[in-house]
Amino acid sequence: ILPGILTFSKINKISIKIIVAINKLESANTFSNKFNQLKDLLGIDDLVKYEFIFCNGSSKNFISQYSKNNKLVAGIISIPDHLHFEWSKTLIEAKIPILVVKPLTLKLEESNELFNLSKDLSIPIFVEFHKRFDRQLKYAKDSFMKGLIGIPLYSFTEYTQRKEVPLENFRSWVEKSNIFSYLGVHYVDVIKYVTGSTPKRVSATGQKYFLSSKGINTFDSIQCNIIWETNNKTLFNQIIISNWVESNKSSAMSKQDFHLIGTSGRIDCEQKERGLRILTDTNYTEEINPDFTRIFSQKESFIFEGYGIDSIKNYLHNILNQDFQNLDCRACNIKEALSST
C-alpha cells in the first residue's frame, strides 16, 4: 500500500500527508525506516509526509485525536481481518471514504451493516481486490463477456501460501481469521468480476492437523464449493481449494491458478508460473511475478509497477476526482464485495 501511495504521488506530482494509526513505538520506527527507504528509492523528496497517532488500537481514539484540527480525505484499512469491521464503521461514521483490504469483514451481517451505513451517509467503501487489475483476469473477463466460452459450467482454483505466513507473519492474530477469508476470498471476487454472477449456495470443509500441532487453532486448509447464477439464470459450480501450510521451500510465496470452463471453451490462468524465474548460487529457484508489485529502475531513481500498485492508484484517483458514477469497473465497491463475504 505504501509503495502505491508514493508512486501515485510521484507520477501525479501531488503532495500527500499520511496519518498512521500506531499502537507502539516499535511499529512507528518500522514504518519510518521503510518510508524513508522507499522515498529515497523513488526520489520523491518531500512530496509525501507522515505523522503518527498513538491510539492504543482504538478506532475511536484515532478519530477523536485526529478530528481536532485536521480533515481526512481518504482512509485505507490494512490491519488484521477481525478488526476490519470496527475500524471501517468508525471511519464511515466520521464520513471518511475508505478502501479496505480483503476480506471486507469476517461476518456477512457486519458487511451488510457497513453497506447500509455507507448508503445512508453517502460515503463510499471500496475493497482492495487487486486481482481485478491483473491483465490475465481482465482478458478473462473480456473473453467471457464476448461469449467465447459459451455457458459456464464450472470453475476451479488452488491457492496456497507458505507455512511462514501463519507461523510467523500473522502469528499474533491468525486464530481470529481463517485461510479462506484471508486468501481464498480473492477468487470468489474473481468470479464476480469476470462473470457478473450471483452466489446462490455455499458449502465448505476444512482440516486442522499441522497448525493445531503447533498450538495454533485455525484450519490448515479449506475447500469451498459455491453455486453461482449467471445473469441468464444458468447455474455453474466454483471450487476453491486453499491452504497456508505449503512448504517454505516453495518457489513462490503463493501458488495460484484460475480456470473457467464453459460449453464452448475454457479460460486457464496460471498465476504463479508467469514465465520468469531466477536461480543463484545463494538461493533456490524463485518464480517471479513481475505483474503484481515490483520496483523497476528509471534513469536516476526507481518506480513501482504492477496490478497491486494500480489498485491503490485507482482508489486515490477515484477519491480525488469524486466521480463515483463513472467508476472503472475494476474498482470493487461494497455492494459487489458482499458476494465475497
Model-found features: residue ranges?
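Beta-strand-loop-alpha-helix segment that lines the small-molecule cofactor/substrate pocket
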Residues: 74, 80-132
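Contiguous beta-strand/loop segments that form the cofactor/metal-binding neighborhood of enzyme cores
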Residues: 182-277, 310-326
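C-terminal helix-rich "cap/oligomerization" subdomain common to oxidoreductases
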Residues: 21-22, 43, 314-341
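Active-site loop of classical SDR/Rossmann-like NAD(P)-dependent oxidoreductases
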Residues: 26, 30, 301-313, 332-335, ...
